[in-house]
Amino acid sequence: MSNENHEELNDQLIVRREKVDTLREEGIDPFGEKFIRSISPEEIETKFADKSKEELEEAAIEVSVAGRIMTKRVKGKVGFTHIQDRFHQLQIYIRKDAIGEDAYAVFKLADLGDIIGIKGTIFRTNTGELSVKATEFTLLSKSLRPLPDKYHGLKDVEQRYRQRYLDLITNEESQNRFVMRSKILKYTRDYMDNQGFLEVETPVLHTIAGGAAAKPFITHHNALDMELYLRIALELHLKRLIVGGMDKVYEIGRVFRNEGTSTRHNPEFTMLESYAAYEDYEDVMDLVEGLVSTVCKQVNGTTEITYGEYNVDLTPNWRRIHMADAVKEYVGVDFWNVTSDEEARELAKKHNVPVTEHMTYGHILNEFFETYVEEKLIQPTFVYGHPVEISPLAKKNKEDDRFTDRFELFIVGREHANAFSELNDPIDQRERFEAQMKEREQGNDEAHGMDADFLEALEYGLPPTGGLGIGIDRLVMLLTDAPSIRDILLFPTMKHRD
């Protein structure tokens, strides 16, 4: 921005503050009080759309509306303004002789961005525009800063994220997206409730960072003089509830991971996790398929959507494929017949798949999948049979114990859900935790730690259980065609300005 523009902005700030002083000298509060609205601009739009000019004149319908000034024209003793409320605009016709000299003087001082209240009657102009003829004018809040240019809005994407309030005022698409986010959350809860799940709340502060492979945020509790972790998953507390006899539970809550940011990652994000006793991962596939397709139909009116360049059909029944079969299909490498870690490493070297010291057969299979397959799964696909090495909380597959009864859901090349038949053998679970701790010693800083309290809970008996985790933010991105996670978080985490 040039120095000239800086001066212009400063001048506007000064002039608006001078108007505040002028109003106060006249005994008028520039930041008014409660204003009772009888109707919104949107309701006027829909309720009176079919009424003629003559019908409205005869009815003389009195209303009370409020909104933000988006346009203003004054010519002598007459003025026009458009007010906006949730992106529905309404024209207001203001005459000096109708609202009084004092109120008209206040109107003349009003700026774009000011919030006003109007009482008056509905009429239709000669051009056919529904409007309100003001009989009373009230200044409700003086805007001390000018809004972004109405024709260009906020073009700086980073400014949209940092100043979401301006984005919501000037960008209807953005506001609609957040309305849809709220609806997606509501419909998700409705679906889970209708399936017999009970919504619960579990702690955000954990004594051990468990339930996922991720780096935690660490804090300190002064009174107890102990380190605590912001939760990286909801899982381990919810499974304790299944032990306690709460057969079907779910939680929608924030989780925190001290990792990088991208178009798909934010350090804090929203997860849905659910657990159902006496079920397995195949039951959870059915749950996910029903949930996502139902919510999509409710918010979009169809299960066929567009995401970026892709046309996606979320209509059940979705494809289901074992991870080893997916790698064989897309890469041509048959991990079913790989018999040793050394053979897996040789294949990785041949196909330019990066490996580190702690990686064994299962890690390498997963690396093949993530490198060559994941991004190609555009239509909804359940990939199941994850290796045991990367699934420390999942039940081993009884036919091939190299794999687990786990799946991930991929749509447009991205993971949207993770689920498994929960590991309920406390002895096996302890051994998995110990293996994870060895990995940590070898350099895998995302490996699980030992959770003795969770192991003790398992020893009382966890019934066979199907567990699920869905990233709500990615689901919202998918259903609203949002290119970045920052587009569907009201206030995404941002680096400090320089």
From Swiss-Prot:
Belongs to the class-II aminoacyl-tRNA synthetase family. Its main location: cytoplasm. It is found in: Cytoplasm. Its cofactor is Mg(2+). Mg(2+) 2 binds at E415. HAMAP family: Lys_tRNA_synth_class2. Homodimer. The gene is lysS. GO terms for molecular function: ATP binding; catalytic activity, acting on a protein; lysine-tRNA ligase activity; magnesium ion binding; transferase activity; tRNA binding. PROSITE patterns: AA_TRNA_LIGASE_II. It comes from Listeria monocytogenes serotype 4b (strain F2365). GO terms for biological process: lysyl-tRNA aminoacylation. It catalyses: tRNA(Lys) + L-lysine + ATP = L-lysyl-tRNA(Lys) + AMP + diphosphate. One of its GO terms (cellular component) is cytosol. InterPro entries: Aa-tRNA-synt_II, aa-tRNA-synth_II, aa-tRNA-synth_II/BPL/LPL, Lys-tRNA-ligase_II, Lys-tRNA-ligase_II_bac/euk, Lys-tRNA-ligase_II_N, Lys-tRNA-synth_II_C, NA-bd_OB-fold. It is an enzyme of class 6 (ligase). Mg(2+) 1 binds at E408, E415. Its EC number is 6.1.1.6. It holds the Pfam family tRNA_anti-codon. Signal peptide: none annotated. This is Lysine--tRNA ligase. Binds 3 Mg(2+) ions per subunit. Keywords: Aminoacyl-tRNA synthetase, ATP-binding, Cytoplasm, Ligase, Magnesium, Metal-binding, Nucleotide-binding, Protein biosynthesis.
